[in-house]
């Protein structure tokens, strides 16, 4: 039994709006134990994720906002969102398929990032609440949107399972050859959104290699983690080496790197990483069928916005 509820889910009324000629809404999920979530079809994003801490107090570990307007106005449109058509940076905003070069919208210096100015995180998706534990969002990206070839159809299903999992399932297809890198961009603080600090969280990643980046955060080559600040093969605190005198730490202004997982490309979800909140005792295990996991430590948070709990989005408030 829960002893205390530190926070509540945001109000559905504060997520009602008309954007791009479509209605936005907030959807609640609850499993049969004590997990609760709130999600919106604006960006197919997670707004809240409430889980019990070591004292059985319900805690919101998903960093976000309490109104739809704050998401629309946010400098970073990715909080909790489904990001695409291609998450991450593409050098020069250019790529080639079958000797045809495509020019994307450039929106990060000289490069493209996170699908362009109108990436999936800025779109209103169609929504279908399947049951109390699942909701499906779907979107059709037209041929040429932000420079990407092909009509691209995507759906994501979020489920709170009775194994205390937030399960994310992505399905997509295109009628032309294209590129895609679809992610969920949740920001977490396992001590609770209001705690402000992630430096003492414990982290372990099942990876002995990572993608090195240049000063523009463009991946350049693979490097081994041994004897570097990127060795999380055993548990370390996030903040232990985050300011190390290391070229890769400096290029990312902290951690902003993809780790290549030891399991390769599994046919079923495999354990990629484990994070533990030092104060809450909340442990999060990340499972995936993908070959890598990206670790980012909120290095560009500037305190410009106010989260649901009333705290600012200060430097490294979440990961």
Task: Walk through the language-model features, giving the residues of each.
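An exposed, glycine/acidic-rich loop-and-rim segment of catalytic or binding clefts
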Residues: 2-319
């Amino acid at each position: 039994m829960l002893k205390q509820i530190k926070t509540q889910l945001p109000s559905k009324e504060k997520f009602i709006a008309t954007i791009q000629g479509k209605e936005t809404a907030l959807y609640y999920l609850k499993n049969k134990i004590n997990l609760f979530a709130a999600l919106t079809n604006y960006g197919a994003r997670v707004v809240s994720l409430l889980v019990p801490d070591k004292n059985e107090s319900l805690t919101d570990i998903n960093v976000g906002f309490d109104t739809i307007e704050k998401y629309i106005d946010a400098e970073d449109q990715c909080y909790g969102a489904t990001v695409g058509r291609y998450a991450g940076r593409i050098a020069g905003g250019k790529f080639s398929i079958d000797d045809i070069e495509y020019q994307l919208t450039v929106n990060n210096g000289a490069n493209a990032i996170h699908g362009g100015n109108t990436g999936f995180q800025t779109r209103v998706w169609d929504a279908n609440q399947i049951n109390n534990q699942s909701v499906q969002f779907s979107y059709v990206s037209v041929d040429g949107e932000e420079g990407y070839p092909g009509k691209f159809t995507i759906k994501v299903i979020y489920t709170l399972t009775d194994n205390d999992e937030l399960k994310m399932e992505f399905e997509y297809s295109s009628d032309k050859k294209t590129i895609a890198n679809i992610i969920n961009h949740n920001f977490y603080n396992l001590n609770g959104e209001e705690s402000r600090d992630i430096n003492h969280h414990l982290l372990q990643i099942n990876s002995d290699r990572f993608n090195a980046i240049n000063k523009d955060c463009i991946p350049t080559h693979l490097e081994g983690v041994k004897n570097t600040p990127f060795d999380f093969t055993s548990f370390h605190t996030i903040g232990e080496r985050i300011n190390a005198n290391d070229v890769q730490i400096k290029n990312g202004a902290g951690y902003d790197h993809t780790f290549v997982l030891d399991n390769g490309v599994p046919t079923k979800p495999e354990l990629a990483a484990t994070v533990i909140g030092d104060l809450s005792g909340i442990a999060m295990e990340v499972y995936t069928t993908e070959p890598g996991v990206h670790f980012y430590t909120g290095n560009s948070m500037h305190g410009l916005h106010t989260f649901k709990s009333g705290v600012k989005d200060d430097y490294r408030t979440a990961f």
